[in-house]
Every structure is written in C-alpha cells, then in structure tokens.
Amino acid sequence: MRRAVTILALVAAAARPAFADDPLARARSLYNQKQFEAAVTAAEQARATPSRADAADLVAARAYLERYRASQTSDDLTNARDRLRRIDPQRFQPRERMEYVVGLGEALYFDEAYGAAATVFDSVLQSHDQTSADARERVLDWWASALDREAKPRPDMDRQSVYVRIRSRMEEELALRPVSGTAAYWLAAAARAQGDHQSAWDSAQAGWVRSALAGGDRGAALRADLDRLVVRGIVPDRARATAQSPELLRAQWEQFKERWRPDAAMKN
C-alpha cells in the first residue's frame, strides 16, 4: 500500500459554527482532522439521538479503522467491526453509503480477507457514484493492495492474472485521470510483481516524470513512493535477472532522477 495515500474524508453535514451544538458534525470534522479518539467520543454523543445513530456509528467505525491502521491494536478493529455490523444503511445518502462500503472493505482487509475486500472496493470503483477524485485515489490503492495481498500466496499462473488485472485498470485510470499518483505507482509495482523487470523500470521512470501532474505534495509523495519501489525492489530484481551490478542500476536511477528533478528547469 502506498504510504502517501491520505484518509478518506467524511462528508460534512453542517457548517463549522454549528459544530459546537452538533456532535455528529463535530465527529466528522474531528475525523477529517485525524483526531480519531475525539471523533469517537463525539460520535458516541451523537448516537444518543436515534435518528443519527447509524451515521454516528459510521464515523466511529471509520475512526477505529484508522486507529487500527496506525496501532494494530485488536480492540480498535473489533470496535470498528461491531459498529459496522449494527449499522442500518438503508437511510444513508449516496455519499454515506459509499463511506459505509469503503469501511466494510477496510475491515475485511484488516481481517486478512483480501479477496473479499478487493471485491468490495471494486464495487466502489465501478459505481463512479458520489466519489471525489481524492476518494477514488484511496479506494484504488486499497483495491490494488488487497489484490496484491491475495495474489502473493497463489501459484505463479494465478498471480500473473491478478497483476495483469491491476496493470490493465491502472492503464485505464491514467488514460482517464492522468493526475492519478496511485495508478502511476501501481503500474510499476504490478509489473515488478509479474517479473516484468523492464516494464517495471520503464513505468517507474514514466511515473517519476509525470508526477508533476499530481502537483505539489502529492507529486513529491509519488516520487518518494517510486524511489522506495525502485531502490528496494526493482533494482535488486533487475540486477538478478540481467546480471548487472545493483550499484550500476542505482547509479542509473539517480542520474535519471537528477535529470528530471522538478526544479531542474529553474536552474538553467
């Protein structure tokens, strides 16, 4: 999973001045600020109003999932699962339904039910319903990560078909959304997982160059992710496959990065 992909922001239901009097709106705001413990507390307060109990449980569940992702504390995952199970999503608006489905996918992923998680995330990607560009980036990363985990223990023939699927979707994403850092990263990562060393190298270079499309911090995050992938994965793999020195390949990568530094044009 890419380190740089951010949390999926929850939709805000009220204006900021009302937060002090609206525990549900406050819980959503705290979640979006990554104050997950405080978000859970506010969500529990909001749950006292029966008509808002399901929405409050959704915020709490997502907050517990983020806490689990950071701490790996089993109680956080259990609490998230308990809240997701008691939600009745029938009255949710489309955006809340999407948040609920993503929460289900994340819980399945953390339960190591990777194939089921990928299926859930795929339903979100296929729907194109109420999904912002940022939300799609995150779900796309979850989907690819789940398939990657599902594929690793499989026989080689089965793994190949999984990574072909990932590469195909990432190519489609880049054609439709050239700014997608997740697609640029996974195009290289999936090629590497297939043992397609040249395509992995080429895709990493292409992703580095097109990182400017992601812009600012996101572009920098994509370059950092690609650099780790190349140095820790693609270079050693390619060195073994081609009998080239890892030091030589790392030097070639460093030279490439220097030629395509984002600020290189400013120095000429």
Predicted regions and their residues:
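Flexible helix-coil transition and linker loops at the boundaries of alpha-helical arrays
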Residues: 46-55, 84-99, 126-139, 171-177, ...
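Eukaryotic alpha-helical solenoid repeat scaffolds
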Residues: 162-193, 198-268
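Hydrophobic h-region of N-terminal signal peptides that target proteins for export
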Residues: 9-18
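Alpha-helical linker/edge segments of TPR/alpha-solenoid repeat scaffolds
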Residues: 64-76, 106-116, 143-159, 193-201, ...
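N-terminal leader/linker segments that initiate helical-solenoid repeat arrays
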Residues: 18-70, 74-79, 253-268
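Helix-turn-helix repeat elements of alpha-solenoid scaffolds
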Residues: 30-44, 71-85, 112-123, 155-169
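Amphipathic alpha-helical repeat scaffolds of TPR domains
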Residues: 52-68, 95-106, 134-153, 182, ...
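Extended amphipathic alpha-helical interaction segments
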Residues: 109-197, 202, 206
